[in-house]
UniProtKB/Swiss-Prot annotation, chain A:
PROSITE patterns per the UniProt record, alphabetical: POLYPRENYL_SYNTHASE_1 (PS00723), POLYPRENYL_SYNTHASE_2 (PS00444)
Pfam families in alphabetical order: polyprenyl_synt
UniProt keyword Magnesium, yes or no: yes
Protein name: Farnesyl pyrophosphate synthase
UniProt-annotated binding residues for Mg(2+) 1: D101, D105
Length: 350, 355
């Protein structure tokens, strides 16, 4: 029963939620800034609105990975706190990216509510709020990890992953801009690069890297693990692209608009590779338009090219390659971490 | 002659420091464009190249150059070695990069039109709100530069913590400015000296005044926790600097200050309007309530006439003299002569400036 108290699945979530409250309270009383009542209320609301509301899979996976690396079912109180805190830093990082992405994409809703910049009184103040969210990570890390031998490594890790993600976002923005003029600019290399940098590093590599640092490891010795996780993250994003078009809106929680938004989606890239001239013309004439008739023509073409079957084959091959790469890793604990990630996403429907 | 050549080659005098500073920008930019942490496409390289030149260059670089000047004074030398020059200039550029990041985002949030005589970056065709991500890239470049050139130095973590803390204070000050302006648009009496001071302290003073000297102190091997008095003096100086800015926005010569001030139109929590609110009689307050924050030139003129009526130019000059006297007294109470020299150097660059 003691084991249960310290971190079985349900209890991990409860601890995770409690630690959010601790961290937020610390940020709202940060001695580095003299808060006014208005500014404290603003940040309180802003943080709840943007950091909460997701599934917290990235954050929780730091705790899960750390347990697997330690070969323990239960973590000590301090260990739980540190792992959850790093997990929340990743959730804060994602919140920062999403707030700014929504502004740049001119989006309307996020997780079933208006995007933060759409909220009355907020508008483009949201850009500074995104910056505040990013700065909260540095404040949290300094408060709880300064003095740890891996503190500088944590700072470098978060900074490097942020740099890769922002660079991937830049690539996405200017590629879409270029693609709107010439759809043939969309290809598998460009798509691979965008998803690798924009999503895979912070969603897959970062949680495991945090767990490795907590375990006292040197990340320079884990280049293979980084590569596997980036590959897994790429596969995850291809699934996202597929589900945007083929997923059940009831399940995925939104109506996909990649076609309307002129996205460099894996589906359109595959279509361009397989289409003959007349089919390509259908893409050139209908991709990136809001008109439901145009969207339907693109979807019909995807069916004609049998892209669902292409995706199934891609998924099967990706899974096999990932499993082979994982099982080539010398550490059994690391293998377990990587398989745990893979099995959470394999053949998911949302 | 060898000595003279070394002196010239290594950066004596203002002009040579500026030359070295400029050369180091080119080197740092090249490193950013070749960063192994990202696979650049030609399009993304061209974009970042242009974005950097547009936003990081173009200012006077006073903040950046003051790292070098301060470091020389702290070391008590006229000449720095090549390595010392490089490290000091690099930290100076990190501050310029930091300011560029803030200004790109501030211009978006303020819906501004021009910056340093050219359209704001987000106004440039093809850019628009991609500028938000460009701001983030600018911030990330600082971390990349620091990791590349300072990792392995005993003060590496201290530099990162310093930049992170100053960034946090600046973003928090910006937030305070944004929500205060929002509140003030509904109720001008929300503007007061305490709020104004807090905004300018956090939004400007830490990164413009404290950060350059703190960088020089770290380069000199100092522990910043032993220099809290220095921090307080520099924050006070930065506050005075911003009050000057507020004054010059309204009373400065546009030819000199390089822009036409719009604090009145923009409903800014300016030191001038705060002083006016403190001194105005009820009917004068009504003039402020009815005319402040409007673009109509007639309304602006009424506010300016009221500022004259309340003799705010004289109030400012008295404030300036008192600030100077207090700052000099605080500086001369510092135990280190080198630190005194650094602080006086900063103060004399800004005292009674007219742009």
């Amino acid at each position: 029963m003691a084991a249960g108290g310290n971190g079985a699945g349900g209890d991990t979530r409860a601890a995770f939620a409690r630690i959010y409250k601790t961290l937020k309270e610390e940020l709202l009383t940060d001695p580095a800034f003299e808060f006014t009542e208005e500014s404290r209320q603003w940040i309180d609301r802003m943080v709840d609105y943007n950091v909460l509301g997701g599934k917290c899979n990235r954050g929780l996976s730091v705790v899960d990975s750390y347990k697997l690396l330690k070969g323990a079912d239960a973590l000590g109180e301090e260990e739980t706190f540190l792992a959850c805190t790093l997990g929340w830093c990743i959730e804060w990082l994602q919140a920062f990216f999403l707030v700014l992405d929504d502004i740049m994409d001119d989006s309307h809703t996020r997780r079933g509510q208006p995007c933060w910049f759409r909220v009355p009184q907020v508008g483009l103040i949201a850009a500074n709020d995104g910056i505040i969210l990013r700065n909260h990570i540095s404040r949290i890390l300094r408060r709880h990890f300064k003095g740890k031998p891996y503190y500088a490594d944590l700072l470098d890790l978060f900074n490097e992953v942020e740099f890769k993600t922002a660079s991937g976002q830049l690539l996405d923005l200017i590629t879409t801009h270029e693609g709107e003029k010439d759809l043939t600019k969309y290809n598998i290399t460009v798509h691979g690069r965008i998803v690798q940098y924009k999503t895979a590093y912070y969603s897959f590599y970062l949680p495991v890297a945090c767990a490795l640092l907590l375990s006292g490891e040197n990340l320079d010795n884990y280049g293979d693990v980084e590569n596997i996780l980036v590959e897994m993250g790429t596969y995850f994003q291809v699934q996202d692209d597929y589900l945007d078009c083929y997923g059940d809106p009831e399940f995925i929680g939104k109506i996909g608009t990649d076609i309307e938004d002129y996205k460099c989606s894996w589906l359109v890239v595959q279509a361009l590779e397989r289409a003959d001239e007349s089919q390509k013309r259908i893409l050139f004439e209908n991709y990136g338009k809001k008109d439901p008739a145009c969207v339907a023509k693109v979807k019909n073409l995807y069916k004609e090219l049998d892209l669902e079957a292409v995706f199934q084959e891609y998924e099967n091959e990706s899974y096999k390659k990932l499993i082979a790469d994982i099982e080539a890793q010398p550490s059994i604990a690391v293998q377990k971490v990587l398989k745990s990630f893979l099995h959470k996403i394999y053949k998911r429907q949302k």
